[in-house]
UniProtKB/Swiss-Prot annotation:
It is found in: Cytoplasm; Cytoplasmic vesicle, COPII-coated vesicle membrane; Endoplasmic reticulum membrane; Golgi apparatus membrane. GO terms for biological process: COPII-coated vesicle cargo loading; ERAD pathway; intracellular protein transport. Zn(2+) binds at C56, C60, C79, C82. It comes from Schizosaccharomyces pombe (strain 972 / ATCC 24843) (Fission yeast). Keywords: Cytoplasm, Cytoplasmic vesicle, Endoplasmic reticulum, ER-Golgi transport, Golgi apparatus, Membrane, Metal-binding, Phosphoprotein, Protein transport, Transport, Zinc. It is a peripheral membrane protein. GO terms for molecular function: GTPase activator activity; zinc ion binding. The lineage of its organism: Eukaryota, Fungi, Dikarya, Ascomycota, Taphrinomycotina. The COPII coat is composed of at least 5 proteins: the sec23/24 complex, the sec13/31 complex, and the protein sar1. The gene is sec232. PANTHER family: PROTEIN TRANSPORT PROTEIN SEC23 (PTHR11141:SF0). Transmembrane segments: none annotated. GO terms for cellular component: COPII vesicle coat; cytosol; endoplasmic reticulum exit site; endoplasmic reticulum membrane; Golgi membrane; nucleus. This is Protein transport protein sec23-2. Component of the coat protein complex II (COPII) which promotes the formation of transport vesicles from the endoplasmic reticulum (ER). The coat has two main functions, the physical deformation of the endoplasmic reticulum membrane into vesicles and the selection of cargo molecules.
C-alpha cells in the first residue's frame, strides 16, 4: 500500500490502514486510529460536478459513493453507513453496469459538488492597521495593503479600521473627503451602542440604496447603511487608496522610558462588532496588523512603562504575568464571537518584540486564520507572505474558502473521539460519538470560518461498543466519509466528499503492523502532544510521549526479554523513534529559548500542516553540497554531517539556512569564485541557492532565510536542531569522531543514547 498515492488522490493518511477488530488489540496498538485529512487538497484529476449530490435519508445523510451497493434492476442503492435502502433519483434512470455515474466509479473516492444554494454575500476583507509605528513601517504596511487590493476579486467587499492611541473606523463610501469615526480605547462599547454611534441601528442599516453584485451568480446584495464602511473594492478602490496614502503615524508623543499607546484589543472588538452587524454568518476575514503589543484598553498585554518587560514562559507558568489571564480571557471570548459569526482573523506581526500572539492565538486558531511572524513590515517575510495569502488557482479564484463545516460519518464498529486542528466543535452530536475524548470532542462536526488547500486536520477514532461484544456480529469493513461544506471564492457553495474504506482484522498482528504509517503517526502524536500542552507542562507531555513510544516498541518490536541487543523494529517502524527523538527536542516542546509568541506561532503552524510539512517541522531536512556531490544529497541531521569542505542546506520549515564549512567560507572570502579557473566553486556556492528558490515556491508563510559560516553566531540555528552525536569528545554511532566533525557543546542526550535507553526499557519483562 503506497500511502503517498492515497494522499495524492484523497488528501488523507491514516496511522493504521488496517484496524484491530477488538478493543483489547486496539488498546495494545498504543497509537489511536487517526487520519490526517486535508479537505481542500489540490488534485488535478478530481472532477467538479455542477449538481447537488445524492444523499441518504435523514438522519444519516451520507453521500452516494463508490462503496454503495447499487441494484440496477430495482433502482435503489444501499448506504454502507446505515444500511438504508434509497431510491435512485430520476436523472439516474438510464444508468447501467457499463454506464455508471461518476460518483460510483472506483476512482471517485473524492468528489466535489457545486451546490445550488445561493451565497449570502461575496467575501469580506476588513483591514485593521496599526498606526502606532514609525513612518517607514507605516509606509511599508500601506504599500502592502495597496498591493493586496489589486489581488482581490472585483466584487470583494473591503473596509478599513486604523488604531494607535485611538481607533478610527473609516468611511470609505464618503468620497468628498476622508471621514472617520473615532473611538476611545478605554470604553467597552456594546454592539448596540456601536450601532447607534455608527448610525447602523434600526432602519438606518437599510436606509441606503447601495447595492453590490456577486459575480457569477446574478445575485444582488443590498448593503444598506453599512456601505459607508464596507464596499466592493471595484467601487471604492480609488477613495480607499487616497485614505491609505494620507495615513500618518500616530501623532501622540511617546515620553522617554515608555511604550507607544496601542489599543489592539479594542480595535479588534470594534472590527468584530462591525462585521457582526453588517455581515453576520457571511464569509469574512479580518486582516489584523500589529506593530507592537497592546498597551492600553481591552486586551492589554503589557503596560506602557518600558521597565515592565514582556511576559516570559516562566512568568506565565508561575502565574506572575500581570495582564496575561485577563487578556487571554478577553481574546478567547472575542474568538468565540468571531467563530459564531463565521468570521476569521489573520494576524500579521511586524515587530522585533512580542506583540501578544499567545494572548490572541484563539482569535486565529478558532477561526481558521493565519499567523505571520516577522521582525518588521519592511521585510520580505511579511510582504511576500501577505501577498501569498491572496494567491489564486488556475481559474483565477482565491485559494481560500469561507464558512466551512467538516462533518465525519462512520460505519458500524467505528466511533469518533475528536479533532485536533484550527476550528471549533459544533453543537451537533451524531450516533457515532465515542466516550473517549481526544482534542475537540463530543461532536462529529466542526466549523472553520476560513479554510485553504493547506489546512489539515487530525481526526481520531475508536472502536464502537459492539466490537467488544463477542456475541455480536462484528463488521469486517469500516467506512469513513468526510463532508466539507464551504463557500468558494467564486461565489458558490461547494461540498467536498471523501469516502474511504479499511478492513477490520482479528488476531492478525502481522497485517496490522504492516499497515502502520509511521510518518502519519508522528504527525498525529505531535498534535496530541500540543493539545496536551494546553493543560499540562512540557515535561509531563514529554514523559507521556516517551511512555507511549516504549509501549509501542514492546508490542511491535522483535526481541528477547532482558536482551537489548536482540531488539529489532520492522521497516515501517524504524523511523518512528527518530521522529519522536526530534519532536522532544523541537521548539514545540523544548521552549527554553523561545518567547511565548514564538511558541504560539510554531504550534499554530504544526496544527495546520499536512504530514509532509509536519515532518519537516519535527525533523528538518539537511542536504550536503560538495565538489563530489555538487547537486546536493540528503545527509543525516547529525553533527557528523558538518565538515569544513561542504555546504549544508537546512530546512526547518520556519528557517532555511545555508551553512558554509570553514574551508568553503575561507575560499569564498578570498574571492576564488570570481576567478575563471575556480568556476566549480562558483557553481557550488550557487547550487543551494537554486534549491532555496524551489523550496520557497509555495511555502506559507515565507521562512526566514539565513546564510552563515561554520563558527559564526548564526550557525546556532543549525546546531540547535542536529543530533549532537559528537559532543564533549563522544564519538558518533554513524562514524568515528574525526578532527573534521563539529563538536556540539550541549547536555542534550543524543540519538544513540536515546535508542539505547529505548531498547533497554522495551525488553524489560
Amino acid at each position: 500500500m503506497n500511502f503517498e498515492d492515497i494522499e495524492d488522490q484523497d488528501g488523507i493518511r491514516l496511522s493504521w490502514n488496517t484496524f484491530s477488530a477488538t478493543p483489547a488489540e486496539n488498546a495494545r496498538a498504543v497509537i489511536p486510529i487517526a487520519a490526517m485529512y486535508t479537505p481542500l487538497h489540490e488534485n488535478e484529476r478530481m472532477t467538479i460536478e455542477q449538481y447537488d449530490p445524492v444523499a441518504c435519508r435523514a438522519p444519516c445523510r451520507a453521500v452516494l459513493n463508490p462503496y454503495c451497493h447499487v441494484d440496477l434492476r430495482a433502482r435503489f442503492w444501499i448506504c454502507p453507513f446505515c444500511f438504508q435502502r434509497n431510491p435512485l433519483p430520476a436523472q439516474y434512470s438510464d444508468i447501467s453496469s457499463n454506464s455508471l455515474p461518476l460518483e460510483l466509479l472506483s476512482q471517485s473516492t473524492t468528489m466535489e459538488y457545486v451546490l445550488s444554494k445561493p451565497v449570502k454575500s461575496p467575501p469580506v476583507f476588513l483591514f485593521v492597521m496599526d498606526t502606532a509605528v514609525d513612518e517607514s513601517e507605516l509606509t511599508a504596511l500601506k504599500d502592502a495593503v495597496i498591493v493586496s487590493l489589486s489581488l482581490l476579486p472585483p466584487d470583494a467587499i473591503v473596509g478599513l479600521i486604523t488604531y494607535g492611541s485611538l481607533i478610527q473606523v473609516h468611511e470609505i463610501g464618503f468620497e468628498a473627503m476622508p471621514k472617520s469615526y473615532v473611538f476611545q480605547p478605554a470604553a467597552d462599547y456594546s454592539t448596540m451602542k456601536l450601532q447607534q454611534l455608527l448610525a447602523l441601528s434600526g432602519n438606518q442599516i437599510r436606509s441606503s440604496s447601495s447595492k453590490a453584485k456577486i459575480s457569477g451568480t446574478g445575485i444582488t446584495l443590498n448593503l444598506g447603511a453599512a456601505s459607508r464602511f464596507l464596499m466592493p473594492v471595484q467601487k471604492c478602490e480609488m477613495h480607499l487608496l487616497n485614505i491609505l496614502e494620507q495615513l500618518q503615524p500616530d501623532c501622540l508623543e511617546v515620553p522617554a522610558g515608555q511604550r507607544q499607546l496601542r489599543c489592539t484589543g479594542a480595535a479588534v472588538k470594534i472590527a468584530s462588532d462591525l462585521l457582526g452587524i453588517a455581515f453576520p454568518k457571511c464569509g469574512s476575514r479580518i486582516e489584523l496588523f500589529c506593530g507592537g503589543p497592546c498597551t492600553v484598553g481591552l486586551g492589554q498585554v503589557v503596560s506602557t512603562e518600558l521597565k515592565e518587560p514582556m511576559r516570559s514562559h516562566s512568568e506565565i507558568a508561575n502565574d506572575k504575568a500581570k495582564h496575561f489571564k485577563k487578556s487571554k480571557k478577553f481574546y478567547s471570548s472575542l474568538a468565540e464571537r468571531l467563530s459564531n459569526q463565521g468570521h476569521a482573523l489573520d494576524l500579521f506581526a511586524g515587530c522585533l518584540d512580542q506583540v501578544g500572539i499567545m494572548e490572541m492565538e484563539n482569535l486565529v486558531n478558532n477561526t481558521g486564520g493565519a499567523i505571520v511572524l516577522s521582525d518588521s513590515f519592511t521585510t520580505s517575510i511579511f510582504k511576500q507572505s501577505f501577498q501569498r495569502l491572496f494567491s489564486v488557482d488556475a481559474s483565477g479564484y482565491l485559494k481560500m474558502g469561507f464558512m466551512a463545516n467538516l462533518e465525519v460519518l462512520t460505519s458500524k464498529g467505528l466511533t469518533i473521539c475528536g479533532m485536533i486542528g484550527n476550528g471549533v466543535g459544533e453543537n451537533k452530536k451524531g450516533t457515532n460519538i465515542s466516550d473517549t475524548q481526544i482534542g475537540i470532542s463530543k461532536t462529529n462536526s466542526w466549523k472553520m470560518a476560513a479554510i485553504s488547500p493547506k489546512s489539515s486536520y487530525a481526526l481520531y477514532f475508536d472502536l464502537g461498543k459492539e466490537m467488544g461484544n463477542p456475541n455480536s456480529q462484528r463488521p469486517t469493513q469500516a467506512f469513513i466519509q468526510f463532508l466539507t461544506y464551504y463557500q468558494h471564492s467564486s461565489g458558490t457553495y461547494r461540498l467536498r466528499v471523501t469516502t474511504i474504506s479499511r478492513s477490520f482484522i482479528t488476531g492478525n498482528a502481522k497485517s496490522i503492523s504492516e499497515s502502520f504509517d509511521q510518518e502519519a503517526a508522528a504527525a498525529i502524536v505531535a498534535r496530541m502532544a500540543l493539545f496536551k500542552c494546553q493543560t499540562e507542562d512540557e515535561m509531563s507531555v514529554t514523559r507521556w510521549i516517551d511512555r507511549n513510544l516504549i509501549r509501542l516498541c514492546q508490542h511491535f518490536a522483535d526481541y528477547r526479554k532482558e536482551d537489548p541487543s536482540s531488539f529489532r523494529l520492522l521497516p515501517n517502524f524504524t523511523l518512528y523513534p527518530q521522529f519522536i527523538f526530534h519532536l522532544r527536542r523541537s521548539p514545540f516542546l523544548h521552549i527554553f529559548n523561545n518567547s511565548p509568541d514564538e511558541t504560539s506561532f510554531y504550534r499554530h503552524m504544526l496544527n495546520v500542516a499536512d504530514v509532509n510539512d509536519s515532518l519537516i517541522m519535527i525533523q528538518p531536512t539537511l542536504q550536503s553540497y560538495s565538489f563530489n556531490e555538487p547537486e546536493g544529497v540528503p545527509v543525516l541531521l547529525d553533527s557528523v554531517s558538518i565538515k569544513p569542505d561542504v555546504i549544508l542546506l537546512l530546512d526547518t520549515y520556519f528557517h532555511i539556512l545555508i551553512f558554509h564549512g570553514s574551508t568553503i567560507a575561507q575560499w569564498r572570502n578570498a574571492g576564488y569564485q570570481e576567478q575563471p579557473e575556480y568556476v566549480n566553486l562558483k557553481e557550488l556556492l550557487l547550487a543551494p541557492r537554486l534549491e532555496v528558490t524551489e523550496l520557497l515556491a509555495d511555502r506559507f508563510p515565507i521562512p526566514r532565510f539565513i546564510v552563515c559560516d561554520q563558527g559564526g553566531s548564526q550557525a546556532r540555528f543549525l546546531l540547535s536542531r542536529i543530533n549532537p552525536s559528537v559532543s564533549f569528545n563522544k564519538s558518533s554511532q554513524f562514524s568515528p569522531m574525526s578532527k573534521d566533525s563539529e563538536t556540539v557543546l550541549t547536555d542534550d542526550v543524543n540519538l544513540q543514547k536515546f535508542m539505547d535507553h529505548l531498547r533497554k526499557m522495551a525488553v524489560i519483562s
